[in-house]
Amino acid sequence: SEASFMEYTKLGNTDIEVSKLCIGCMSFGEAGTMHDWTLNEQDSEKIICHALELGYNFFDTANCYSAGTSEEYLGRILKKHTARENVVIASKVYFNEDRLSKKAIAREIDKTLARLGTDYLDLYIIHRFDYDTPIEETMEALHELVKVGKVRALGASAMYGYQFYNMQSTAREHGWTPFS
């Protein structure tokens, strides 16, 4: 089968097994909510189903992609075509009111989980560095999500190396979950 050609690896320092290729879902969602070039649910479903057939198990979206409709499409399509434990779902947070404050993170994870139709994320990624929120507040809020089982692993994107280092160091100093 075509799926036998897919290679898998562990996600960072976790035991989460991911396909070496990930399907980015920024192009899935209701047109006009973010971009006019996004794919409708039917076309998104064709791509996701073909990816599953090829052995992809790793899907990445964000709370802001097409005003959340990317997460909605992905959740409905995956639920229709595979068991939750067969896929690794990543989503991102930042482009929202209060960015990476404790309040915003708590609010946005619940909205993301509802849109995806799941009770946990495999990987929660901060989309940017938040200059307005103390690192301690962000890292503690993310740690709480892992502690209560809403998130299995943490990630970060689009920041300077020293910012990533400072966030990792802060997590380790306080005994909180670091980025994977």
Question: What role is predicted for each listed range?
Answer:
Residues 10, 18-22, 57-58, 86-92, ...:
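Structural preference for beta-strand elements that scaffold enzyme active sites
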Residues 5-8, 129-180:
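Beta/alpha (TIM)-barrel catalytic core signal, keyed to glycine-rich beta->alpha loops juxtaposed to Asp/Glu
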Residues 113-134:
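Active-site groove signature of glycoside hydrolases
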Residues 37-51, 100-116, 164-168:
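Short, acidic/polar
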Residues 70-73, 101-104, 134-138:
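Residues at alpha-helix caps and immediate loop-helix transition turns in enzyme cores, especially N-
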Residues 26-28, 62-64, 92-96, 126-129, ...:
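Active-site beta-loop-alpha junctions enriched in small/polar residues
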Residues 29-42, 93-106, 127-132:
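Active-site mouth loops of central-metabolism enzymes
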Residues 2-87, 147:
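N-terminal binding-site loop/beta-alpha segment at the start of enzyme catalytic domains
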